[in-house]
Amino acid sequence: MTITPIRRHVEPSYAVLRPLLGSQATVLASVLDGGGHVPLTLECLSTPVAWGGAVTYSLRVTGPSEQRLVPGRYELMHPDCTFLLSLFAVAEELRFVHYEAYLSEPL
C-alpha cells in the first residue's frame, strides 16, 4: 500500500518562492510530454518590478532535456507544498531545458 504525503497547496508568491530556490520539485508530465514525473530545480527568481499597481517577476526552473515539457500549466510538487505555474521553455542546452513562469501580485 502506497501512502501519498499530503502537501499544502499554496498560491505562488515572491515570499513563498524565495525560500524554495535551489530546491527540487516535480511535475506530472502530460501525455503530450511523454508522461511520468519530471524533476525541476527552482533556479532563479528575478528582482520584482512595481508597475501599474502590481509587482511582476519571473521564476526560472530547469529540467532535463530528455523530458522536455510542452508549454502549459503544471502543478509543481515540492516536499513542503504544491502550487500551479504556467511554464514556457526559454532556453535549451545539451542536458537541460530552462523554463520561465511569469507572475504578478497586487501592491
Model-derived segments and spans:
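Surface-exposed, beta-sheet-biased, low-hydrophobicity segments with strongly acidic/polar composition
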Residues: 1-107
